[in-house]
From Swiss-Prot:
Keywords: ATP-binding, Kinase, Lipid A biosynthesis, Lipid biosynthesis, Lipid metabolism, Nucleotide-binding, Transferase. One of its GO terms (cellular component) is plasma membrane. The lineage of its organism: Bacteria, Pseudomonadati, Pseudomonadota, Gammaproteobacteria, Methylococcales. Its EC number is 2.7.1.130. It comes from Methylococcus capsulatus (strain ATCC 33009 / NCIMB 11132 / Bath). One of its GO terms (molecular function) is tetraacyldisaccharide 4'-kinase activity. Pfam families: LpxK. Transfers the gamma-phosphate of ATP to the 4'-position of a tetraacyldisaccharide 1-phosphate intermediate (termed DS-1-P) to form tetraacyldisaccharide 1,4'-bis-phosphate (lipid IVA). Belongs to the LpxK family. GO terms for biological process: lipid A biosynthetic process; lipopolysaccharide core region biosynthetic process. It is an enzyme of class 2 (transferase). This is Tetraacyldisaccharide 4'-kinase. Pathway: Glycolipid biosynthesis; lipid IV(A) biosynthesis; lipid IV(A) from (3R)-3-hydroxytetradecanoyl-[acyl-carrier-protein] and UDP-N-acetyl-alpha-D-glucosamine: step 6/6.
Length: 336
């Protein structure tokens, strides 16, 4: 993302999460966007969708920016495996250059496949395919042996059939000013949540009926050699913390809650890291980054860089509900 785009994004974020009313021009564009969203969803609801013959779980959100979808997808893959399923993941591959269904490997180029799909493959080791056409990616993942499809960030991709919809909500920022793009952060109206199967609240206070998810990460891993160190070991040191994710404040808050003192550096989401980003950091100063950023920094070979793996801990009631839905599918009962 260019510097000018980063400035625009920061300005929009201020509009979306401020109490003041956004400018009239943004509100007018928002009404047009809302009409287009309604037409598109109506079209796909009226027209029959292709059946994939296996259950499809869609994980997404209403808001643009990071809400914690990727850790949840990883947790879902692990949960499904524990209960005898063979999950495969499909994604558009944000900012990736792939146009046809492309399998993601642990050594894939994030510029080609996207950083989230690459992280999912590295963490789970299971089949991950990316394509702007998720139905094609789903067929590819089924051919690779999957018997359940998990779609990363596919809530608004209505061409893809789905049996379970999971919407992730930022429990602190919630829905901002509650407006649709570009006047607000929403891709769809809040009322859309009434039709999903699960609303998962990441941090903050959950609303009625929402499942709770917390992200846990107390260990740092040196990018250059894999050395692991408790984050508490960095207490009292001079530290730089960098994040090029949708909501960097969450990462910084996590470090602060662990008692670390650091200089925060926020980059635009999906920032492409280069050695220049670290030139101003003193040679003896550790740099803490997110696990998602780490997939784009592996070629830098900089011993100062440490990343923090996080894992999603889910509400105890979540797994039985999800598995019950999938078991009905296994016994020939669709969830539609």
């Amino acid at each position: 993302m260019s510097r000018s785009n980063g400035v625009i994004d920061a300005w929009l974020q201020r509009q979306w999460y401020a109490e003041a009313q956004p400018p009239w021009g943004l509100r007018a564009l928002s009404r047009g966007f809302g009409a287009a969203v309604a037409l598109r969803r109506g079209y796909y609801r009226r027209n029959a969708k292709v059946s994939l013959g296996v259950p499809v779980i869609v994980v997404g959100n209403l808001s643009v920016g990071g809400t914690g979808k990727t850790p949840l997808v990883i947790a879902l893959v692990e949960l499904l495996r524990q209960h005898g399923w063979s999950p495969g993941v499909v994604s558009r591959g944000y900012r990736g250059s792939a146009r046809a269904p492309l399998e993601v490997f642990c050594g894939s180029d994030p510029a080609e496949v996207g950083d989230e799909p690459l992280l999912i493959r590295q963490r789970t080791g299971g089949p991950v395919f990316v394509s702007p056409r998720r139905v094609e990616a789903a067929r590819a993942v089924l051919a690779a042996g999957a018997d359940v499809v998990v779609s990363d960030d596919g809530l608004q991709h209505y061409a893809l059939p789905r049996d379970v919809e999971i919407a992730v909500v930022d429990g602190v920022r919630r829905y901002g000013n509650g407006r649709l793009l570009p006047a607000g952060p929403l891709r769809e109206p809040v009322e859309r949540l009434a039709s999903v199967d699960f609303v998962v609240c990441n941090g903050g206070e959950p609303g009625p009926g929402e499942s709770v998810m917390t992200l846990e990460g107390r260990t740092a891993v040196r990018l250059a050699d894999g050395e692991r160190r408790p984050l508490a070991a960095f207490a009292g040191q001079r530290i730089v913390a960098m994040a090029g994710i949708g909501h960097p404040a969450r990462f910084f808050s996590h470090l602060a809650a662990l008692g670390l003192n650091f200089e925060p550096v926020a980059w635009p989401d999906h920032h492409a890291y280069s050695p220049d980003d670290f030139r101003s950091v003193p040679e003896d100063t550790p740099v803490l980054i997110t696990e998602k950023d780490a997939v784009k920094c592996r070629r830098l070979d900089d011993p100062r860089i440490w990343y923090i793996p996080v894992s999603a801990r889910l509400d105890p009631a979540f797994a039985p509900r999800l598995l019950n839905i999938l078991e009905r599918f296994r016994h020939g009962q669709t969830t539609a």
